[in-house]
Amino acid sequence: MNSNTKIIFVTGGVVSSLGKGVTAASLATLLESRGLNVTMMKLDPYINVDPGTMSPLQHGEVFVTEDGAETDLDLGHYERFIRNKMTQANNFTTGKVYQSVLRRERKGDYLGATIQVIPHITDEIKRRICSGIADDVDVAIVEIGGTVGDIESQPFLEAIRQLRIELGRNRTLFVHLTLLPYIKVAGEIKTKPTQHSVKELRGIGIQADVLVCRCEKKFDDSEKRKIALFTNVDQDCIFTAEDVDTIYEVPLKYNQQGFDAKLVELLNLNAKEADLSEWQNVVNTIRDVKGEVIIAMVGKYVSLTEAYKSLNEALYNAGYKKGVKVKIKFVDSEDVNENNVESYFKDVAAILVPGGFGSRGVEGKIISIKYARENQIPFLGICLGMQLAVIEYARNILGIKDAHSSELEPTTANPVIGLITEWQAEDGTVHQRTHSSDLGGTMRLGGYKCVLKQGSRAREIYQADEVVERHRHRYEVNSNYVERLEEAGLIFSGRSEDNKLMELIEIPQHKWFIACQAHPEFTSTPRYGHKLFESYIQAAIENSNN
């Protein structure tokens, strides 16, 4: 971080899930539209080292960066809103901070000192914030996870309080997001929760510079004056976060309120006028959609749609590019069997099986894949979805009835899917794993190059000889079965650069049947979409019209 970089800290109060991530990303979008180089960072107060082994039903999606970090789903928002790509430096947790401090204590780096939250933990938090910001960055927006008042967040709040003192008011800004409940029966907006949230923040030494108030409806100047009086925040530094039809409208709403202009003023930034024409085009495209296409997503985490956040957004973005609204029908794979499968898919235009781990609901997914293959329904499989597509093909086309994955059935005699014991990373380093390796941080993670087969549908879609997509898996197609599968009509249309790992499959006789080992949803954005998803949605549109 250079001596001119400005930092905006975004905190939240009253309740969680107010939209701190979207607000932070929207502010970054606005500043980027003014010609500034902006990066973002998310600090998570949980003690896990990363979210890699956490249940998606508790945490939501694990977003994978290009350099292989397993991170919070908010980093997906960041990449969809701004152009800068996130890395492992853009997200860290309490667990990672403590791990680093304890490792240094064991090495003797603290020279016998008693290790304490202050100064050792807070110093490590400050070090990670500052070292994670590149020298060419004009503004860094740092989102603090959790809610003010949570015991887990206190070391992070103390660290940013100290950074305000060390860097000065001209280089730091505190933006606090709170809830303004609207009581419909009384027809009133209640400001008391916001007052108490700001008071709680002041109690630990942080005075909010800007307030963002989440509310069902717009509030008028009388409410602003009341909030300003009791929170010690200037009235012109209080903004509304109102509900919108799509999160991509949020930057435009903030711009209309003069939010970005106020940030430029408060931080004395040398910025040009905002050019939001590209972002306005995105919103116009979303508003102009006509028609609807229904996609069935068959998974086991469907009770929490945040578990598939990037995938949902990739489908929506592809729909916008094709001029239709994508409606996702979430199907719990545990409920699907041979007797009822048709009832789940009779009204859908396409079927998708996403990534996942563990054996729960696997047979329902395989039955769904078989139904898509036999009934010429466009199908997309991702990660585990590709592995199960290979298993289904081996069972029902090759006749290997006990074909399975060694992850899901360790004693299977026909492991068409097996553990990757060795692979080469993009930087040339060789990774090795065994069945006894730790689960956390031991997968094939991050961006890897995939070489596409000439004449394949995948090659036609991507319009390239090779493509880089992000991975998160430890199992792959067993190379001992590849030749037999190809002889039976399955095409491996994408392979790793060393030709050892199967990355893409397709069935040429099918209307549209593609599955990939990677997670292409992580690189889809509302500006640019993603070619694979756009082709898939186009196939779904054509299928629904027939």
From Swiss-Prot:
Pathway(s) of this molecule = Pyrimidine metabolism; CTP biosynthesis via de novo pathway; CTP from UDP: step 2/2
What are the binding positions for CTP in this chain? S16, D150, I151, E152, K190, T191, K192, P193, T194, Q195, K226
Where, in this chain's numbering, is Mg(2+) bound?
Answer: D74, E143
Query: Could you say which residues form the signal peptide?
Result: none
State the source organism's domain of life.
Bacteria
For this UniProt record, give its keywords in alphabetical order, as a comma-separated list.
ATP-binding, Glutamine amidotransferase, Ligase, Magnesium, Metal-binding, Nucleotide-binding, Pyrimidine biosynthesis
**What reaction does this catalyse?**
UTP + L-glutamine + ATP + H2O = CTP + L-glutamate + ADP + phosphate + 2 H(+); L-glutamine + H2O = L-glutamate + NH4(+); UTP + NH4(+) + ATP = CTP + ADP + phosphate + 2 H(+)
- Give me the ranges of the annotated region Amidoligase domain: 1-269
The record's listing under Pfam families reads:
CTP_synth_N, GATase
Residues binding ATP are: S17, L18, G19, K20, G21, V22, D74
What is this enzyme's class at the first EC digit? Answer: ligase
Tell me a GO cellular component: cytosol
One GO term under biological process is:
pyrimidine nucleobase biosynthetic process
How activity is controlled: the entry says:
Allosterically activated by GTP, when glutamine is the substrate; GTP has no effect on the reaction when ammonia is the substrate. The allosteric effector GTP functions by stabilizing the protein conformation that binds the tetrahedral intermediate(s) formed during glutamine hydrolysis. Inhibited by the product CTP, via allosteric rather than competitive inhibition.
Q: How does it assemble?
A: Homotetramer.
Record's function text: Catalyzes the ATP-dependent amination of UTP to CTP with either L-glutamine or ammonia as the source of nitrogen. Regulates intracellular CTP levels through interactions with the four ribonucleotide triphosphates.
Stated name of the protein: CTP synthase
Q: Which organism is it from?
A: Francisella tularensis subsp. holarctica (strain LVS)
